[in-house]
Amino acid sequence: MPRTLAGRLAPLLVAMGLQGMILWVPVEKLFMSQIGFTPASVGVMAAAYAAVVPLLEVPSGILADRWSRNGTMVLACVGLLVSSIIGGLSHNVATYVVAAMVLGVYFALSSGTVDSIVYDTVLEETGSSDLYETWIGRVRIVESVGFVVSALAGGVLAEATSARTAYFVTLPFAAAAIIAFLRFDEPRLHRDVEPTSLRSHIALTFGTILRRPEVLQLLLLLALVGTLAQAVFEFGPLWLVALAAPAVLFGPYWAALMSTLGVGGYLAAKLDLTRTPIVVALAVVTPAATVVLALTRSLAAVVIAQTVLALLLAVVAIHAGRLLHDAVPSAIRAGVSSGAGTASWVLFLPFALALGWVGREQGVPRTGWLLTGAALLLGALLVVSVRRAGRASEPARPEDLACRELVDLVTDLLDGALSPAWRKGVEAHLSACDGCTEYLRQIRTTVEALGRLRAHTVQLPP
């Protein structure tokens, strides 16, 4: 394993661990009740938060692609800082709703950006994406450790002081995360393509999402993964309430769910998800876990089933993310990846309403059947997507010929001798081909070095 890759990603790992130290999360509902929230006002806050994230996710991804992914993550941490400050200073519902909306900006800015950073860094350092799942898995492990530690420490801190204090103690961790992000050497692949207008970039991003069936299929798969995962984290505790679980169980239960993000990251790097039997096993066990939730009245079985479900979803999310990154060029990678988050929110809102209605009318366990339906569709999409990706990885003659044609045109491209029509075609090919983009970057670097050498030679005295 390349040592330079480990050293380069070390600041990113530190930043993600610090960013996960949000100490107020475990006591948020307690604090909200203290400042006057009712079930109705909680719904208003959730609606405001849910409206912000999907609206900003794709635009923030395009910002990351055109400007700086590191800079976008710094802005995300600033959003977390501002949200925590407003939340900690809140004494009424209206102010806290503003804090929740700013937190939505934080999630929108970070959605899809970290995955794109890791993928391009691995690609730059190793020349392939083979180690992507290993390193994004390590990122998820570090992030999970931050979540678990903050979940336990936040409760202890609130008990010793107050829930409000947890908001302010979060601030130094978010500030330290900004410093760590600034120390990270961001990959440059997404900047090597010839700059295009914002309008062209947006058109290419949405065109890739809407007109390429394999990309649309992967986005739907990731959206289903996100919807199910969010359903587990948002509605999972209701099973414990329905089964009259003791209060002492909620802390370890939540820590177990948080730990699945890290364990899932570890397993995603170890499991060979290009093998059909393993993929089919995931596609079968995932809905089986939801069936247990629908049928059992055992508290232990519910906790185990939810933990297994969250773990499997974490594994699938990482592999599906790699398939998506493999399918799109670096220049639009963060924007397209953010589209999965947007689609997840669009699916989750009606799904959450359906879960709430079924839970109220027929009891919480019956909502497990809705999860089963979504899990079956997820399993089918997973199998189809992996098989499709396997076929797509075989060398294709037309693409090879297109790359050879571009190599023949490089001289005219660098000399500015291409006609506008040919130049547009070359730029379109570069936007979809990381290999040719890297080749052109190396040629330009060589030409610049030769130019500097020639200038130095001319200036030498006789």
Report residues per predicted region.
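Cytoplasmic helix-loop-helix junction between adjacent transmembrane helices
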Residues: A99-S144
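Helix-loop junctions on the cytosolic side of multi-pass membrane transporters
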Residues: T170, A174, I178-T196, V384-S393
